[in-house]
């Protein structure tokens, strides 16, 4: 679970990241498609899955808005992300394991874009945060 220290690290880093969130989201999404090709199946209707394509940029922005929402609700992710969890489980029917693939791509993207900030301590805190977000998003699957 997230300690107070983890929450402090995540909130502080989000403050630095916010201005580049849309670009980071598109890059992380494109990275996920390359590293985890099975995730492309949810977006087969998009002709271009690169970070520069319109649909990837748009969805990257949506994802990062969700991450920002999770940061705001970091003290109660299951309740705070309940509607998003329901959307993923019932309407979009996204495999809950895809969250782990998205988290791995996001961590690599964040490390590449913020090398000076991406300390081992931040890495651990972000990893725990993304795991908690993934668990909250998969809550409606149970």
Curated annotation (Swiss-Prot):
PTM field: Acetylated on Ser-1.
GO molecular function: haptoglobin binding; heme binding; metal ion binding; organic acid binding; oxygen binding; oxygen carrier activity; peroxidase activity
Residues with N-acetylserine modification: 1
Record carries keyword Iron: yes
Top-level division of the source organism's lineage: Eukaryota
Cited CDD domains: Hb-alpha-like
Globin domain sequence ranges: 1-142
UniProt-listed Pfam families: Globin
Tissue: Red blood cells.
InterPro entries found in the cross-reference section: Globin, Globin-like_sf, Globin/Proto, Hemoglobin_a-typ, Hemoglobin_oxygen_transport
Biological processes per GO annotation: hydrogen peroxide catabolic process
Family: Belongs to the globin family.
Job description of the protein: Involved in oxygen transport from the gills to various peripheral tissues.
Assembly, per entry: Heterotetramer of two alpha and two beta chains.
Other remarks in the entry: This fish has two types of hemoglobin: one cathodic Hb and four anodic Hbs. The cathodic Hb displays a small normal Bohr effect and a reverse Bohr effect in the presence and absence of phosphate respectively. In addition, the cathodic Hb displays a large phosphate effect.
Protein name in the entry: Hemoglobin cathodic subunit alpha
Organism: Ophisurus serpens (Serpent eel)
């Amino acid at each position: 679970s997230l300690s107070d220290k983890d929450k402090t690290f995540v909130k502080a880093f989000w403050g630095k990241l916010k201005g580049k969130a849309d670009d980071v989201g598109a890059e992380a999404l494109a990275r996920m498609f390359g590293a985890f090709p099975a995730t492309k199946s949810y977006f087969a209707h998009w002709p271009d899955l690169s970070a520069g394509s319109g649909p990837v940029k748009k969805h990257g922005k949506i994802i990062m808005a969700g991450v920002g929402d999770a940061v705001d609700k970091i003290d109660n992710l299951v309740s705070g992300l309940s509607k998003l969890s329901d959307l993923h489980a019932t309407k979009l029917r996204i495999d809950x394991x895809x969250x782990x693939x998205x988290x791995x791509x996001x961590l690599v993207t964040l490390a590449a874009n913020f090398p000076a900030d991406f300390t081992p301590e931040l890495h651990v805190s972000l990893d725990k945060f993304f795991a908690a977000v993934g668990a909250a998003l998969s809550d409606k699957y149970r």
